[in-house]
C-alpha cells in the first residue's frame, strides 16, 4: 500500500500540477511502486468548485447509486477520462483533500464496480458523499481511510446525509472546550500535514 504521508503529499501537489483537467476537475496520475495513484484536486476559489460543492441535492447515478450530485457527476467524468488513458494500469489508489477526497471516494467505488483493481482510498477532510448509506463501499476489497483533523467542520456535511459508511480516523485532537467548537482552519491542507506528521498512522 502507498504510505498515507505520500498520498497527502500528492493531494497537495495536485493543487499545482495535473495530468488532465476535465470540466474544471484537475487530476494528477502518477506511479508509486506498482500502484497507479489518482489524486484529485480539492476546492479552489472558483465558481465551478463552489457550485460543485453546493450541489448537495441527493442524486441517483446509475453507476454509483444515491449521493451528493456535485461529487457523483464529477467522479463519473474522472472515470470516463481514466478509462481511455491506456498508459494507466492498476492496481489503483485514489486520494484527495476536501472536494478532491469526495470525488476520489466516489471514483474509487465506481472503478471497483467496473472491475478495476482498486486497492486503497485515502481522503483528507472529505465531506459526505453517499446518501444514508444507500451504497455500501467494498470494505473487504479496498482499504479506506478518511482523516478528520481536529474539529474540521467539512467532514460533517451534508448533515442530512446521515451516518458515514467509513468512520473518519481522527488526528489533531483538541482538548477541553476547543473540541466542541468547529474550526475552519482545521480543514486546511497545511493543518492536515502538521497533524499527520505528529501522529503518523
Which residues does each predicted region cover?
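Non-catalytic, mobile gating and regulatory segments of ester bond hydrolases
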Residues: 1-95, 99-201
Amino acid at each position: 500500500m502507498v504510505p498515507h504521508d505520500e498520498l497527502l503529499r500528492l493531494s497537495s501537489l495536485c493543487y499545482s500540477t495535473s495530468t488532465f483537467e476535465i470540466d474544471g476537475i484537475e487530476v494528477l496520475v502518477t506511479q508509486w511502486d506498482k500502484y497507479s495513484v489518482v489524486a484529485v484536486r480539492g476546492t479552489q476559489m472558483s465558481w465551478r468548485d463552489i457550485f460543485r460543492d453546493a450541489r448537495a441535492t441527493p442524486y441517483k447515478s446509475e453507476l454509483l447509486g444515491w449521493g451528493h450530485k456535485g461529487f457523483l457527476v464529477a467522479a463519473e467524468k474522472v472515470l470516463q477520462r481514466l478509462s481511455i488513458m491506456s498508459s494507466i494500469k492498476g492496481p489503483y489508489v485514489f486520494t484527495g483533500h476536501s472536494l478532491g477526497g469526495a470525488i476520489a471516494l466516489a471514483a474509487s467505488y465506481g472503478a471497483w464496480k467496473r472491475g478495476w483493481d482498486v486497492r486503497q482510498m485515502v481522503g483528507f477532510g472529505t465531506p459526505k458523499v453517499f446518501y444514508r448509506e444507500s451504497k455500501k463501499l467494498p470494505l473487504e476489497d479496498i482499504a479506506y481511510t478518511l482523516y478528520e483533523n481536529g474539529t474540521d467542520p467539512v467532514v460533517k456535511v451534508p448533515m442530512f446525509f446521515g451516518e458515514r459508511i467509513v468512520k473518519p480516523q481522527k488526528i489533531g485532537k483538541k482538548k477541553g472546550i476547543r473540541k466542541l467548537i468547529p474550526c475552519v482552519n482545521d480543514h486546511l491542507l497545511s493543518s492536515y500535514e502538521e497533524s499527520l506528521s505528529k501522529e503518523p498512522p
